[in-house]
Amino acid sequence: MKKYLISALIVAGLTFTGAASAKKLKFQMSSKAGDWAHTYMGEKAKILSDLTDGKLQIEGLPTKSVVPHRETIDAVANGILDGDFNAIAYFAGRDPAFAIMGDLIAGYDTPKQYQEYCMHGGGKEMLQKIYDSVLPGKILVLGCGPYGKEALVSKVPINGVADLKGVKIRSPEGLAADVFRRAGASPSSIPFSEVYTS
């Protein structure tokens, strides 16, 4: 993911390399200021700025600093933000395919498998079609940024499907939430930045 993020940011910057003045892009993230993802993005943004002699800069804004996390694609489409570094499963309410592309629980063994699908198996093009179905011609997909598998943490023992009944679970929207709901759980989609405070 590290190499890919730099590549995606450089691709985004190719449009601006001939510009006489610096271009500063504002990307809203799904993480709070200071957490690992926000820090990571800041480090990569500095590398990008150095590689372009300061002609292209990216400011990673913390979650909800401009718009709520589920409204970032509208903000990009309307020119309020220049980019979005967010979990696309949050947009599953608009098109269920966002859930499949954004958080296919147990669909891949590693983030690298998903990255390979995105870059070499048609995934990036599929994701572009999904965005175009919601906001035609307003969003350009530069790539995918998969996360590794997350743990299912619970205050009560879960030894099988029956133990999920009545348990409140953090889950992405769409397919995953539907599976948990059918198993009797109460799925809730909350941003990662709010996990420890919920």
Q: How would you label these PLM feature ranges?
A:
Residues 1-4:
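Positively charged n-region of N-terminal signal peptides that target proteins for export
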Residues 7-15:
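Bacterial N-terminal signal peptides
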Residues 16-22:
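Sec/Tat signal peptide C-region and signal peptidase I cleavage site
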Residues 26-44, 63-67:
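Extracytoplasmic "Venus flytrap"
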Residues 45-58:
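Signal peptide-proximal N-terminal region
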Residues 45-46, 87-187:
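Contiguous mixed-secondary-structure segments that line small-molecule binding/active-site clefts
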Residues 53-56, 72-86, 168, 185-187:
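Alpha-to-beta junction loops
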Residues 61-74, 173-175, 188-197:
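Short helix-initiation/N-cap motifs at beta->coil->alpha
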